[in-house]
Amino acid sequence: PGMSPERIADRLHGFMRELGYERYGVQGGDWGGWIAPLIARRHPESVVGVHVNFAMGAPSEGDPTEEERAFLDFRTRFDRAETGYSWIQRSKPQTLGYGLTDSPVGLLAWILEKFWAWSDHGDDLFETFDRGLLLTNVMLYWLTNTVTSAARIYSERDRTPRPVERLEVPVGYAKYPREPWAAPRSMVERAFNVVRYSEPARGGHFAAMEQPELFADDVATFFSSLP
């Protein structure tokens, strides 16, 4: 309890300082797409740049553009059909945790369903992801008994105010085609100082695992462009 995204951001900054880095870059997808910008907001003097492949951006104060409206309509449908997991993790993480820590099959299903729903895999998940890599991902939660604490971040986020100021630290935004939370560039630019924008040809929510070479190249290109 109490391990909010803000606290995680401060912990990660502290780790970098302990390692001797006065200035560093951060990258984030999924929850990292939330926490990486928080590190820059809370410690802007230390962060040279932020690269994200998950960004919901900020809505327009006026009428949304056609692209923004299409995204918002999609998100309304998507949230209704695909975010039940989020609501239970936000409201009852401890209750859910008892079930998932007691059943390896239940934990496997809970996690792999998201790989299926959110990735760019066609109709064969194992053409995109190595089976061993997926099992390793699940086992990290199982062997360490941490699925409950991982779920609690959803609840902790709701207890803290969300940032409203535009982030002025340089940001690189990679908009992958099968990322459900990939907001249009215009929305992201309202929230962040986007100095590099890219649309990789393939990839989804788990871009670093799905397309590691494309992902690494995009991240490296962004940071190499910074002064």
Describe the residue ranges of each PLM region.
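Active-site phosphate/pyrophosphate- and oxyanion-stabilizing loops and adjacent acidic/basic residues
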Residues: 13, 37, 186
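Conserved acidic catalytic loop of the alpha/beta-hydrolase fold
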Residues: 6-24, 34
